[in-house]
């Protein structure tokens, strides 16, 4: 396979929540055979805006469909390559040594669980997918107004995870996959899927000088073997 490797780096733009799983996958021999790969992890909103403004990229994996739609509107997606790669769940987390016990449901006392001066760590609800899902879920359950002034907003979901892992905040809302990858936190409860839109990670190749290599990587990411790796990291594989 060495003769098929490309000389320049394949540039992947990926939602920050994918980092633990994707780092493992990128190190696998079948992926390394493609050639050098660089992954830029950030909030999907930030990555989509970069692509929209002409930043070079070969593959984009977003944490929601809205930001993939923004990229598609630029005309830069390779025809026939967009698809839904992964699913996820939204969870309420606390530091692993914390004692908070809380059942998520309509009107649940999230503000009370934060204590007198505790804040709730979430990704920015105005633009970052994890924060948008969190706000939608809390609004659906009737508790958003009680905590909206007590947020510890983060630039992406992995930063929100770190707030809780370091016990800077008593509670946070992240993806299930984030909690799986961080032993310093525990899941307090999972938000009902009906409280927010389905959490979908779409993927697409971006027009570039080496669409062939991007297609090869996309095929590997959509394989059952790699789907099993994603599942170990807390994602739902949406490919057969």
Place the predicted regions along the sequence by residue.
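Exported/periplasmic ABC-transporter solute-binding proteins
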Residues: 4-55, 62-65, 69-240
